[in-house]
Amino acid sequence: MYLLIVFLPLLGSSVAGFFGRFLGSEGTAIMTTTCVSFSSILSLIAFYEVALGASACYLRIAPWISSEMFDASWGFLFDSLTVVMLIVVTFISSLVHLYSISYMSEDPHSPRFMCYLSIFTFFMLMLVTGDNFLQLFLGWEGVGLASYLLIHFWFTRLQADKAAIKAMLVNRVGDFGLALGIFGCFTLFQTVDFSTIFACASAPRNEWIFCNMRLNAITLICILLFIGAVGKSAQIGLHTWLPDAMEGPTPVSALIHAATMVTAGVFMIARCSPLFEYSPTALIVITFAGAMTSFLAATTGILQNDLKRVIAYSTCSQLGYMIFACGISNYSVSVFHLMNHAFFKALLFLSAGSVIHAMSDEQDMRKMGGLASSFPLTYAMMLMGSLSLIGFPFLTGFYSKDVILELAYTKYTISGNFAFWLGSVSVLFTSYYSFRLLFLTFLVPTNSFGRDRLRCHDAPIPMAIPLILLALGSLFVGYLAKDMMIGLGTNFWANSPFVLPKNEILAESEFAAPTITKLIPILFSTSGASLAYNVNLVADQFQRAFQTSTFCNRLYSFFNKRWFFDQVLNDFLVRSFLRFGYSVSFEALDKGAIEILGPYGISYTFRRLAERISQLQSGSVYHYAFAMLLGSTPFVTFSRMWDSLSSWVDSRSSFILLVSSFLINKSSQE
């Protein structure tokens, strides 16, 4: 049963890929959706047996690589962390498959699309179930490849091509860091198996001094692993690919942002918690990076006009919350927020897809407005998702986001306070852009064309069913799972993840945190909603004043241009590497030294020599006699010296040189 959870999506993808031409769009959609749905049902059974029954399951299938000290096998690990991720991935993926049946019904390449969705799901399941770093890396690279194929699905669009290449290249930076971290684990522990590495993590580690700094082997490995998470989970510095990934179909965006790809980095940190717990330096770095990411993405999203990009930046901001929750050693709360976030983020993306699908692929919110009457169901769904996103009391997001902020405050460290205040301010911006999205899309006077309004319609039944199910999850999952997953004294995470006793602060955040810290997120959410209402619906004079102010214009450009991260990366990194690649690698090395000293240079030298020799052929007898004399003289001299030279000159080399010279001379004459 456990193996079927992983391999059923692979079966559906294989059938869609090899027989999609014969099954057609409907047959392929039914096959892939059925396989992923069965996998989702089996995930619920596994959740009952493993998480609720507190019995982890280890499956060792077959040996994979065995070379001296290196031994890797095909194995699967099903513990509490794994089964939670299985439910998230398979449930969201099955709803996205069902949604795509209607959304992609008019696309002639829908069988290929369903094939890509299923293989994406398979690689994510392979990532979360692997019991060693090598298998995790296989799934890690697989989801990167599948995301490239899905973002690049409409390959005739230039922006989709550029976005897919950008996602692939930016993620290669993080993948390189993850690979170095895995190499470091093997060097230090002589294995890539999770259980062995985690059991030995507390043993004495190697330390050395570099640039007057004391470095620890575990710290270095954790930093390298975190670089992998920075790339995959779109943290500050490597986050630029995430908004551009919106060029793919909307179901792809929902799957990437809710259940797969971006959650892989958070999962990897939670899985490697026994390593990170013994590296306080790495935890501090993770906390600062996550807090800065949440603030950066929240401030960037407030002035975006693309419907999907606003939701994409909200994903980036929420990933920052998950990351700095891991940095303060509360991996269970981070995974809980990941699960809650999957429901309302998939709901937001699929609701946005319903609007875009009905509005003839229009994504600019400024060209919408007044759609609440035409899309009552979609408006209600997006309202529920937005309220859950901002942490409205008693909705799903409220039970995880507020706990993360309380934990950051009760950490009583510089990094914890930094994360608390940046996270709290990010709540204000999150509330602002969430309600701005609702106002500009559904409530302001209409700005769309009349012909678009005549054709628009609410979500059809196949698209409405996933929205309703996700809305129920956005309303009740946090309340139902809170006590089980992050309640005091719960045994849910008995086998994974691991937290040192000195880092346990959940009880302190529950009872020792001041009341004001519990009210700050609610106050900021209310303030953000009120500000969005006043700016976008009421105060036209505020907008005019904002447009005429030089400072406000510069601030608008700064946030709208995404803190100029793309420009900085292009000017200082991309163009520098392009210049280096052309002037040094191409001109100086490839077309320079390698060609001159390589085969081209040797052939050119012999060819020029043969041309000079051929000029001696003048047709005069005395010239030939003189040439014979010049040729015989060194020959006679050389034959006399042969006995002394034969000890260090190879006669075979001399023969080869003589014959090659003759052939080159003959070819030059022809």
Curated annotation (Swiss-Prot):
GO cellular component, alphabetical, reads: mitochondrial inner membrane; plastid
Which residue ranges does UniProt annotate as crossing the membrane?
Answer: 3-23, 36-56, 76-96, 113-133, 136-156, 178-198, 218-238, 250-270, 283-303, 319-339, 340-360, 375-395, 425-445, 461-481, 618-638
Domain of life of the organism in this record? Eukaryota
Q: What is its EC number?
A: 7.1.1.2
Return the InterPro entries for the record.
NADHpl_OxRdtase_5_subgr, ND/Mrp_TM, NU5C-like, Proton_antipo_N
**What reaction gets catalysed by this protein?**
a ubiquinone + NADH + 5 H(+)(in) = a ubiquinol + NAD(+) + 4 H(+)(out)
Where is the protein situated, by its record's location annotation?
Mitochondrion inner membrane
Question: What UniProt keywords apply to this chain's record, in alphabetical order?
Answer: Electron transport, Membrane, Mitochondrion, Mitochondrion inner membrane, NAD, Respiratory chain, Translocase, Transmembrane, Transmembrane helix, Transport, Ubiquinone
What Gene3D superfamilies does this protein's entry cite? 1.20.5.2700
A single Gene Ontology molecular function, please?
A: NADH dehydrogenase (ubiquinone) activity
Q: How does it sit in the membrane?
A: Multi-pass membrane protein
Q: What is its main location?
A: mitochondrion
Q: What processes does the entry annotate via GO biological process terms?
A: ATP synthesis coupled electron transport
Q: Which family does it belong to?
A: Belongs to the complex I subunit 5 family.
Question: Function, please?
Answer: Core subunit of the mitochondrial membrane respiratory chain NADH dehydrogenase (Complex I) that is believed to belong to the minimal assembly required for catalysis. Complex I functions in the transfer of electrons from NADH to the respiratory chain. The immediate electron acceptor for the enzyme is believed to be ubiquinone.
Q: Which NCBIfam families match?
A: NDH_I_L, PRK06590.1
Protein's recorded name: NADH-ubiquinone oxidoreductase chain 5
